Amino acid sequence: MSKQKELFANEEIAEAEKTKLQPPPMYKVVLNNDDYTPMEFVVEVLQKFFGMDLDKATQVMLSVHYSGKGVCGTFTAEIAETKVVQVNTYARNNEHPLLCTMEKA
């Protein structure tokens, strides 16, 4: 028997417990409808901050307009928070009351 086997023959070797990684919680970034922000500005925001093409941005804008809110995307908490701040800051800087929020997906 080899020396290494002899050293551990009478001892149990503990295996490192493998921890299962959980995916991070996800959050939806949502635009909320108001009566003052122009539809064109909403489309601009969706293209600028969410990388949507014109057709997709128009579709989401119409969802905001007719349903009261529209989902811009689903992200991890940090990214969602950043996008909410970016959109709200951009809207205020352009004197629009557009409100962007986040909610658990």
Curated annotation (Swiss-Prot):
Signal peptide segment: none
InterPro entries with a match to the protein in the record: ClpS, ClpS_core, Ribosomal_bL12_C/ClpS-like
Subunit structure, as described in the record: Binds to the N-terminal domain of the chaperone ClpA.
Pfam families: ClpS
Gene3D superfamilies recorded: 3.30.1390.10
Family recorded in the similarity comment: Belongs to the ClpS family.
Xref: PANTHER family: ATP-DEPENDENT CLP PROTEASE ADAPTER PROTEIN CLPS, ATP-DEPENDENT CLP PROTEASE ADAPTER PROTEIN CLPS1, CHLOROPLASTIC
GO biological process entries: protein catabolic process; proteolysis
Source taxon at top rank: Bacteria
Disulfide bonds: none
Function statement: Involved in the modulation of the specificity of the ClpAP-mediated ATP-dependent protein degradation.
Full protein name: ATP-dependent Clp protease adapter protein ClpS
